[in-house]
Amino acid sequence: NTGAKAPRKHLANKAARKTAAPANAGIKKPHRYRPGTVALREIRKYQKSTDLLIRKLPFQRLVREIASEYKNDLRFQSSAVLALQEAAEAYMIGLFEDTNLCAIHGKRVTIMP
């Protein structure tokens, strides 16, 4: 007995695994941002912008639909619809700001309807 240990089988298996080519060799995974990164980037983008975020024609249809409940065949100046849209978006932005403050106060991140 020389005292030398017999080679272990799992070492041979490990070496064989290293030399074998992986199934997806040469295929690079597409780049993905971590969860929340894109959301934060969008928040910064929309906070900087001053343009209207709701499309004009769908908003105009909504205004006409609501107005038709009170009186049919009403006509609107384009500036009147624009003023309504500015007011509606300003109200919604304020509402979301307050909602976010409430979520932070409640130690929450997500807001839900």
From Swiss-Prot:
Residue ranges with Basic residues bias: 1-17
One Pfam family linked to the record: Histone
GO CC annotations, alphabetized: nucleosome; nucleus
Presence of the UniProt keyword Transferase in the record: no
Chain spans, region Disordered: 1-31
GO MF: DNA binding; protein heterodimerization activity; structural constituent of chromatin
Domain of life: Eukaryota
Keyword line: Chromosome, DNA-binding, Nucleosome core, Nucleus
Matching SMART domains: H3
InterPro entries: Histone-fold, Histone_H2A/H2B/H3, Histone_H3/CENP-A
Family indicated by similarity: Belongs to the histone H3 family.
Description of how the protein assembles with itself and partners: The nucleosome is a histone octamer containing two molecules each of H2A, H2B, H3 and H4 assembled in one H3-H4 heterotetramer and two H2A-H2B heterodimers. The octamer wraps approximately 147 bp of DNA.
Protein name: Histone H3-8
Originating species: Stylonychia lemnae
